[in-house]
Amino acid sequence: MILPDRWGQGQLFAFSALDGRALAGDDFPGMLCGDRVGVRFFSHVRRELAIVPLSGPGLTFDAVTSDCLVFGFPGQERMRMVYARPHLIIGSVAGCAMPAVFVEGPCRPERDGDTEIHDTLDGDVTALARCGDRFAFAFGHSREEAILLAREGLALSPEEEQARKLSFYARHGVGDDHPYARLYAKCLSVMKSQLYAPEGEFATVWSTPDRLPHQHMWLWDSIFHAVGFRHVDATLAQDLIRAVWVHQRPDGFIPHMADVGLTSDITQPPVIAWGAWQVYAFTRDDSFLREAYEHNARFLAWCRVSRRLTARELYTWNTTSDVNCRCDESGMDNSPRFDVPGPLAAIDFSCYMANDVRHMALMARTLGLEEDAARYDGWFRQIRDDVNAALWSEEDGFYFDLDLSAGRLHRVWSAASFLPLFAGVCPPDRAGRLAEHLQDPASFATVFPIPSISRKDPTFGTDMWRGPVWLNMNHMICEGLRRYGCTALAEDILRKTVRFADQWYRDDGVIYEFYDSSNLRAPSRLNRKGAPFEPYHIDVRLQAIRDYGWSSTLLLDMLRQLYPEKR
């Protein structure tokens, strides 16, 4: 069994809903430290649990997963740190090593027998209990709660808890002969860490983009998570999609972000039907399909009424004046597409609508709703025709947004303009011209494809959606290329995506939010709405986020596509 074994600062360490009651409203997540074997926990006042001293040659790691760390020196017993229960980390040490807690703020330390207590006077308390080579570190909202949980933790076997955690990879990992077995296992590790248990309005398990710094649910992130999770647990994948419409309003609107008792007032790309159809291919659960169909019918109807500014079937995102996030609704927050102040008939929004409408027709036929299917077919044709009539530049051989205020194409060379392939709205000759752009080294054929902005565009850079590579775009564009018969090109892009993501996992121990299209700069050195900040510090959050959810789920799906025979 091959396990993730690369240590890297910023890796997630958290309790998963797959193992019990992981609540978003009472979470105690951590990240691996960069300067020692330790975990920094994100309570109100930050705390760090570290193993000290760990000096000398030959320290190796057998497992570095999102809830289990196994490590040690040659000739010694292996040491471990396991997230065994909600708010409880247990472990064992060897040699002269011992656990230590460091608190990054006001704290009233105490000792009660074998237990060290850290009360930060804000309602959060941690306790570290030790017995021989074992230790237990617990978080609570009172001194008594933390002490009790830590002492209960000493009764647990770190070795048995380690075996329980790592059995997940035995069940769901791939064979040792898979060329990317370790990357596959790393994807599983991140995926596991993203899951919260049912809570409040959420009747099912639900997911979050990265646990830290995002701790809420996002619409299209959840769909991308489901696409990966269908290979692990297709029933769970259905639940991740169900969670998306928990906060749907009576008028059909679905918020882009939600949590227990919390919703936003903007939406996100309509990809629900597409995602539900991918999951349905695994489950053949007609009741789930009907549920998704009914909720999404209302959502698409809301989009048609609320996000269309012309008589044509072209769709417009909500935008703001925030220069770093003009279009959060599109998911492409700071793309130069939105540098213009006026509204755009957006190529991506229109294509997401076309693609979801097309999948609604497939769902309707499967459910025996022939009249609905015919209606969705007609709607799809309307979007297809309007996209090709209004958003195509014959001179450039490319699709662009339409600046509705100026009445002309807004010529920003963005990866969003390849989404007509994904939506299936391209005539074959135009699909061929798009493929040419993807093979042009001066434009989109970068070392690590596909840049979010073409190299020849004056806005091309290294800041988030202004040049770096995003795996969700690669996934959708490659699906579109295959639809149009460009199989070799799609496979080449997927192979490069996997190869370079694996390279950076081996170097840095994490799966990143986005990557450098030249593959020369570490993703941690790329701008994220500003210059990068080192060391990694999520309270500042000006770095590519580490152990990112959809990067992991879609990488796993790409590996399944590239190596279908490897299980």
Each language-model region and where it sits:
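A short small-residue
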Residues: 336-339, 360, 476
